[in-house]
């Protein structure tokens, strides 16, 4: 039986590669656990090829397989955009999650909370303008 594949979203990749990102520490801890699971063959790690290419840390993601976005994925995503009005990049990711039957997603994009997707770690939400901000 093949281990489940977990998607590393662009927000997760950026947080992991950028030490100044507010989610860096959480991403680093999650990635350690994911790599341990990968080494123990309990999961496979995947990310969109275009998302991986946008992060300048190829050695950091050596264990991550690339998912290439094909024309059929873009076409399905465009239909989703027309039907729901969501962002094309998110729609492509949702299409890949469904097509590849990805079990979990590691990411910090709060929009994932609106879908039937199992997230790895908490999804952070931006500070509301009415909430006090701590120094």
Describe the residue ranges of each PLM region:
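Active-site neighborhoods of divalent-metal-dependent phosphate/nucleic-acid chemistry enzymes
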Residues: 65-106
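Acidic active-site catalytic centers that drive phospho-/nucleotidyl reactions
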Residues: 9, 90, 109
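Metal-dependent nucleic-acid phosphoesterase active-site entry motif
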Residues: 1-22
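PIN/NYN-family metal-dependent endoribonuclease catalytic core
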Residues: 7-8, 26-54, 61-62, 66-70
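Acidic, PIN/NYN-like endoribonuclease modules and their adjacent C-terminal/linker elements
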Residues: 1, 94, 99-135
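Alpha-helix/helix-capping structural signal
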Residues: 11-12, 72, 110-111
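Short helix-capping/linker segments at secondary-structure and domain boundaries
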Residues: 19-23, 49-53, 99-106
């Amino acid at each position: 039986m093949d281990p489940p594949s977990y998607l590393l979203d662009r927000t997760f990749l950026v947080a992991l590669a950028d030490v100044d990102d507010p989610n860096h520490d959480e991403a680093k801890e999650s990635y350690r656990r994911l790599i341990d699971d990968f080494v123990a063959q309990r999961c496979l790690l995947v990310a969109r090829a275009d998302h991986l290419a946008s992060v300048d840390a190829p050695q950091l993601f050596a264990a991550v397989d690339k998912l290439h976005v094909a024309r059929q994925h873009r076409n399905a995503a465009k239909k989703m955009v027309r039907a729901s009005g969501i962002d094309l990049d998110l729609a492509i990711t949702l299409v890949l999650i469904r097509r590849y039957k990805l079990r979990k997603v590691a990411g910090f994009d709060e929009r994932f909370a609106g879908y039937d997707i199992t997230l790895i770690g908490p999804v952070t939400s931006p500070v509301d303008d009415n909430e006090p901000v701590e120094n």
